[in-house]
Amino acid sequence: MKIIDLRTMRGPSYWSVRHHKLIVLKVDLQDLADTWSNAMPSLAAQLPELLPELEQTPPAENSKTIHKHPPLTREQLADGEPLGHVIQHVALALQRTAGMPVYWGKSHPAHQDGVEFVVFSYQEERAGRAAAEAAVQLVDDLCHGREIQLKPIIDELHEIREEEFFGPSTWSIVSEAASRNIPYIQLKNSSIIQLGYGVNQKRIWATTTSYTSHAGVEVAGNKNRTKAMLKDAGVPVPYGTTVYSEAGLRDAVEDLGFPIVTKPLDGNHGKGATIRIMNWEDAVEGLKAAQVYSRAVIVEQYIQGDDYRLLVVNGKLIAAAKRTPAAVKGDGKRTIQELIDEVNTDPRRGVGHEKVLTSIKADQHTLDILRNQELTLESVLPEGQTLYLKSTANISTGGTATDVTDLVHPYNLLLAERVSGIVGLDICGIDVLTSDIAIPLNETRGAVIEVNAAPGFRMHISPTDGLPRNVAAPVVDMLFPQGSTARIPIFAVTGTNGKTTTTQLLSHIVASKGYKVGHTTTSGIYIQGVQLQSGDCTGGQSAEFVLKDPTVNFAVLETARGGMLRSGLGFHTCDVAVVTNVAADHLGMRDIYTVEEMAAVKGVLPRTVRKNGWAVLNADDDLVYAMREKLECRVALFSMDEHSPRIREHAEQGGLAAVYEEGTLLSTKTAISFGLIGRRSFLLRLAAGLPSISKTPWPQLWLATATGLIKTTLSKHFGLLCHRLPKLRAE
């Protein structure tokens, strides 16, 4: 087998309007052309054994996918399946085995004999492309009886996932935004995520946001400054000092006594911290561990109690968790290493942020803890004895969390909300040591030991025990309060001829109403009338360029077939889509050989229009007119034939339509001669004018444009005759 072409779709495309992240493979089956799986006994016998995920059904939340795209079973392989279909399922199963839950795909023959199109979903683009190549090679090897090495493939995919997939905190915010129909864009080569479009966009970086104060982050990052500010505000904090050397450490120990804690002055997430130090030797080691991260080291009294994390968003406490360091419990038989291995078999544990818990690693810090207790990894722990393997309770080092949100005493709740305001953070993780979070902190002699910018959400959204909390919802509420919008109006134009002219006219109309327009054409990208890029800019990346611009509040996007076939659209939905026409141009390029296939490509655009938006279609073009049958949005038609039966039928049903009456423009007030306007030019102007005349309530952000473009203005510029029936009349 040979891969002829491999494309990555990133938005609605010819292959699927609903499924956006797709790999499109064009595979030459070569000597396996017309071969089905039942003709290859080694394939049917070995593949399910090598890749058990092939036969796994999607989880309940993907139940719709189960019926449309069921798993590939060994019975089906034995009965006979096309090899393109097998490749599709193998590519999906490889990704799922590596922790990426993808299920959708399809395959069908290409125009050339022995060539198949294989289309399947991906979670991470690089992983999808790697899975495509691996799937083709794997099926080819099995068919030809070659040796199979599957583990390196899965390891590579797993590594890609760990490198590129959102962390749990970021993903919780992104998925919450997506559930509210808020679009997102991951900025190139960055962990920064843009939520929303244009002037309405907000950004997140992990759990810092567009509203996160730089001063607040700086304060939280300097633990001495944080402690001083909290102490001045009456918040209990541990007594301590800052040292830079062993001499300073000795003075601090003489002042504080044991037990003590050492931690870097500007550290975070427990890095470099050592707690409950009981002797001078360990104090020196703690100093060295902290100075890996900061020359300045905080030495402070050790506060007895359990470790709690209080999460405050936008000034309100929204979650609390009790954290426990990574630990094992002895059974009197197995070694500490064996106990660690057993804990790591918990299916909830994985590498890094892959799952809700992180696998425990016996690192140098763990070995030091064991050494201090005269233990090694080969020691057998007595039955019932609990051994803590880390000095801090971070989830990222194997710790566990129990939700205690409903137990927080009102005094402690107020304290947490005050701390957030004192430090000046919109999202704030407050670490507290106390014997019981249900008792006021001033009664337990507990203390606030640390304040964190960019706190992790994993312990709250997926606690080991207790009720999961949707802590991302308050973040999205803060970024996009009720009544606000994340979107900007998007008008998109496609067709064989007239796209650029129509786009330019629409952009001009909208700009004349005071909007800051970004538009794309075959000549370049324009922001508020200024050309920022030149060349053919009608693809998805150019659309994203406009939608990422923070000054733009209206996008008008020329959308050509090349970009749609290359990578799909640069947006998922639009407000208005205009299709001017479909002609037999560019056939034979990118596997589009018929005008009907070209119409299917162009037809992607109107299918992305929101339900209360408009698809503006040319009623004189049979293929364009037929697009209305697949649409869920409202449809407006235009025609050069004032007696068009299609227009009449549409208008009789209450639809919006525009026609050209030869030589004369009818308006509610005037009759103006347009004898010098050519028919083709006028047709394009009709297409440009229609989206702007509707009085139907659209999103408040752009309602002013729709209603402001009154018929008199349109008559002056474009010559429109608009019909709404019953009673065929000009409006």
Where are these regions (language model features)?
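ATP-dependent carboxylate activation and anion-phosphoryl transfer catalytic cores
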Residues: 1-179, 316-319, 324-338, 365, ...
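Conserved ATP-utilizing enzyme core subdomain
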Residues: 347-388
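Flexible active-site lid/hinge loop adjacent to a nucleotide/diphosphate
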Residues: 531-650, 686
